[in-house]
Curated annotation (Swiss-Prot):
Name this polypeptide is given: Transmembrane protein 208
GO process terms (BP): autophagy; vacuolar protein processing
Function: May function as a negative regulator of endoplasmic reticulum-stress induced autophagy.
Organism: Xenopus laevis (African clawed frog)
Region (Disordered): 151-174
GO (cellular component) term, any one: intracellular membrane-bounded organelle
Record field: transmembrane: 25-45, 51-68, 105-126
Entry keyword set: Autophagy, Endoplasmic reticulum, Membrane, Transmembrane, Transmembrane helix
Main location: endoplasmic reticulum
Membrane topology label: Multi-pass membrane protein
Subcellular location: Endoplasmic reticulum membrane
Similarity-based family: Belongs to the TMEM208 family.
Cross-referenced PANTHER family: TRANSMEMBRANE PROTEIN 208
Amino acid sequence: MAPKGKVGTKGKKQIYEENKETLSFYLRIILGATVLCGAINLGVFYSSSNFWTWATLVFSGIVYAGAYRSMRSMAQASFSEDGSLLDGGIDLNMEQGMAEHIKDIVLLTAIVQVLSCFSLYFWYFWLLAPGRALYLLWVNVLGPWFTADNSSTVPQEQNEKRQRRQERRQMKRF
């Protein structure tokens, strides 16, 4: 059963603390996946490593760096001169926020990176990221724009007059 009433808001300090925890959690994921992939490729599969193995490692590093830097800049807190917290930054744990999509990219990259230690074909799963971006672009921007009807060309006054006329006609029938 859903809780009744208004959802409680978070304070600046709570957002600041949760953002620090979130950033450290995703940094551990990034470092863990990269170290694991590097150790497996260097230790176990070194003889079968090729250019694409290392290119995907560099690609994932670039994705990680961009995503982590974006999350860190979103969570940037501001303090006053006396050291008190003025702004806790953007809440990284907010649902349907941009940070949620960035966290999904980090998780997808980590999963694909670890799986790619065994087969480079797992990198095709990374195509889910641009696919999801195109889907969101279509649903939120392009789809409504293409399917919007052109009723806005008729002035609002004429629409109201037509509606009143139709109401009068309906009243006469009864």
